[in-house]
Amino acid sequence: MSNKNRLKNLAKVLLAITLVGVIIGINLPLSSLTLQTWGISASVIGFAASMTGLATVVITPFFSKLINRFGQMGIMRFCLVVLPIAIAFLPIFQNIYLWFLLRFIIGVAATGVWLLSEVWINALAEDQHRGKIIALYSSLISLGLIVGVLISSLIPIETGGGFFVSAGIAIISAIPLWNMEDLPDFDVVEDISFYRYMVTAPGLMGSSWIMGFLYAATAALLPIFALPFVENDYAQSSRTVAWLASGELVMPLFVGWLADRYDKTRLMIYISCVSVITLAILPVIFDIAVMRFLFLFIVGGSIMSFYTLGLTLLGQEYKGKVLASANASFIFFLSLGEILGPPVVGAAMDLFGNNAFGWFMAIIGLIYLIIFIGSNAAGNLKRSNKI
């Protein structure tokens, strides 16, 4: 592929993924706050938010076979059609059980767009620029998220109009991707062993899991956590997600630049430490506006940096036919985190109070940090014994 076509295809994917970020930014706070107005508990709201992650876990084991049978663009076009239709049905059916089903369908469609976009980004990016390109990719998702949250905060929740706006943007996002071509010579390895990837690359797959857990929990439940601090103002509580996303926009660019120059294992440890400390302090300082914005910025940035650094390592370690299966495994573990994050943190908030939002996630982050350091120490010892 010529350099011109490579850059053109990269630009198409980056534009589309920015619009997908807008869709996420509208749907996440809008869905949580809509259910809250129905009188739904935080744990059930979290469970509803986890439906998209559950869909990803269900579909990813079959993803490689589907690509080989229907082609990359066959899968992509199907997902681009289903996504806006499912979103548009949300305000029509005000039934929690139907919402579970619709969010599951949205998750299936979003997974196809998401996974193929990541495969294309990693396949099109050159190694010497991989960290920066993936950082740009993740930052553009966050930029879209900020725009989406701001759009959501301007539309009254009671009207359901935000969902129709989101569906319209989903249609627009299909335009740059619709005429993409399959990557040449890209049959995919169909035997995806998630256990093998977990054992051989625990730090890499663990980074996707912790990112999914923290990202989904904060995006879904931050507006609920924020309500008592903003006098139950729904618009203000939804805007807190924009501050979270601003960190997700800026910090990965810096981390991606560092990832091309410095030791990635140390970077992962530093990121983990920052996330644990800021999450632990968050409930204590949240009623101070300036500190609230600062800490949300840092929390969001550290969470998205798990993703940026993990995806950079993935593209560096896996090439060719195994790239799609490795990427599917990466998203599988991320989605396991997404499934667990909202309902588990929501249940902690129901049991232990609102402040459990930050403290419980800090404990989970600390456990991951210990596992990551231990697994890398074991790996280094094994390599030294071989020498």
Regions flagged by a language model, labelled:
Residues 6-53, 216-226, 237:
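Helix-loop boundary and gating motifs at the non-cytosolic
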Residues 42-43, 127-137, 234-235, 318-330:
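Loop-to-transmembrane helix entry/capping segments in MFS-fold secondary transporters
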Residues 59-71, 156, 251-263, 349-350:
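Helix-to-loop junctions at the C-terminal end of transmembrane segments
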Residues 74-88, 266-281, 362:
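Structural signature of the two symmetry-related core transmembrane helices
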Residues 97-105, 290-298:
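Paired small-residue
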Residues 112-125, 305-318:
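Intracellular juxtamembrane helix-capping segments at the cytosolic ends
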Residues 167-186, 371-375:
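C-terminal membrane-cytosol helix-exit motif in multi-pass small-molecule transporters
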Residues 320-351:
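A late C-terminal transmembrane helix in Major Facilitator Superfamily
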